[in-house]
Each structure stands twice: as C-alpha cells, then as structure tokens.
C-alpha cells in the first residue's frame, strides 16, 4: 500500500512483539496479551510512534527546501521531542511551540523529560499559555510566520504530525508489518489496542487493517477527553489516508472504534486507576508506560479484559507508542513509586 511513497529511514526496522504472559495470567489467563514495542523503534532520542509518521514527512520537508522544522505540542509533548531529534538528524533547525495543555503542577514540569530533551537537541523552545486543543493553533502559525520574518524557510508539522497530508501513512505501514509478523507467529491478532488523541496513529491503523477486514478490531482508547472532536479527526485522517494509498473503499464513522471511558479527569492528568495500571504493568512485565497516553490505554485494556469485552481465547495486541520520558514531569505523583 505504501510502495509509491518515499520514506526516510529513522527506525531500526520492524518493532518486536512481546508476549505479556504475567499480565495475562494476572487477569485470569483467558485472554492472551501481547505488546508491539513502538517505544523501542529507534535510537533517536528514545524513539516512539511519531517516528513512523515522520519517516514519510521528512522527504517532503527536504524537497521543500526548508531549513527549519516548526511544530507544536504540550509542555511534555513526545511529538515535539521527536521533531527536535529528527531536525538534528537531518541537519535542520527546529522551532517548537509548547502550550500549557495539561493542568498539572510539578515543580520541574517544564524543565525535565521531553522538553529538556528538546532543548538538549538544540530546538528553539517557546512556552505558550494556551490550553489543550487537537486542532490547528494560532500560536503555531505565529511561530511559522516568525521564522519566515527572520529569513528562515519553515516546514510546518502539526501537533502529533496528525493532520499533515502524510500523517497517517506510518501506521498503515504498522498494519502491514503486523501482518508479516503474524505469518511468522502462526496466528492473527483478534484486537489491536491503541491510545488515541490527535488521531493519525489510530487512523493509519484503521486504513491498514481495513485491507484484511479488521478496521473495527482496532480499539482506540481516548486520552484526549474531547472524544467527539478526536473521533471526527480520526475519521477525517483515515478517509484522506485511504484515498492516498488507494484502499478502494469508503470508511464510515462505525469503522472508528473509540472508547471514551478512560481519559478522565482531563488530558494529561492520570486518574488513580491510570496510576494503578502503570504500576501493575511495570511490576508484572517491567514495561514502563506514561501518565498521559500509554498509562490510559493500558488502564483501558486491563479494564476491558476484566469486564469480558474480549472473548475467551482472544489474542490482543497492545500498541506501545512510547512516551516514558514524560514520567520525569510527574516526579511528585510517583515519588513513592
């Protein structure tokens, strides 16, 4: 599906699939849980899911003649960290807008974790007080205009790389990669669980798994706490991506499965249940998830297993998208583990 698109390699190759045997047993042993370790996909600044997306965006950025990547996210954005790392790797400058998306108070929240790494990587980081929104932001446009005014040649990458024209391609590739790994494993996964916020990871999976009729087996766990906007954005990206890759069929709102039950209390703030899921996964599997994204999708998967959502005998693939560096911004929350 992706043969006609240029790709700039930023990852090691196919990410490993790991059986979560102890977690599966702890939850009753009726459902087999696995994790696809997107958090281990690259040596670039701790890696993560955004690199799959950026591999298809970088060729366009280079071809444009740009000298500066300009992007946006929250203070502890994984995406902006990855944009900063990619800019360093390809020899461009980087301008980042870090908005106040999370009502979280930690003494060093804006000095550790992802934002610290972005600064180390050489990005020009600007803090902005605007609150959370997955849409196009005026602060981002202002940064683009400022780079131009100072003689730079900006290349704009939206939050999460999601509404970029090529933003969904990387996770179409994820689905193709899973199919190849399933052939080696000798079975297919019944469900795929993924965290959903800006939408292109989920959207790309919907398109990629639609090729074999599993689009509704992609279970998005909302972490945005704005599910109506998020679902609409996933569907829009999925439709545009389907057209790009020539899927050959329309996608409907029913093809986007988004569970709204675990995003509380708000984006970026972990509930007690999210914190419990982070600890449980760490203590049973040694696998670290974060309070913003993967902790909430892990909470969702655990709860869905406990509620019997997945039929006995199901094989469930958890997409671990990365994000552990953000834990540094939650030092007080996890001060006792």
UniProtKB/Swiss-Prot annotation:
Gene3D superfamilies: 3.40.50.1100. Its cofactor is pyridoxal 5'-phosphate. It catalyses: 1-aminocyclopropane-1-carboxylate + H2O = 2-oxobutanoate + NH4(+). One of its GO terms (molecular function) is 1-aminocyclopropane-1-carboxylate deaminase activity. Keywords: Hydrolase, Pyridoxal phosphate. The modification N6-(pyridoxal phosphate)lysine is found at residue 50. The keyword Hydrolase applies. InterPro entries: ACCD_DCysDesulf, ACP_carboxylate_deaminase, ACP_carboxylate_deaminase_bac, TrpB-like_PALP, TrpB-like_PALP_sf. NCBIfam families: ACC_deam. Catalyzes a cyclopropane ring-opening reaction, the irreversible conversion of 1-aminocyclopropane-1-carboxylate (ACC) to ammonia and alpha-ketobutyrate. Allows growth on ACC as a nitrogen source. Homotrimer. This is 1-aminocyclopropane-1-carboxylate deaminase. It comes from Methylobacterium nodulans (strain LMG 21967 / CNCM I-2342 / ORS 2060).
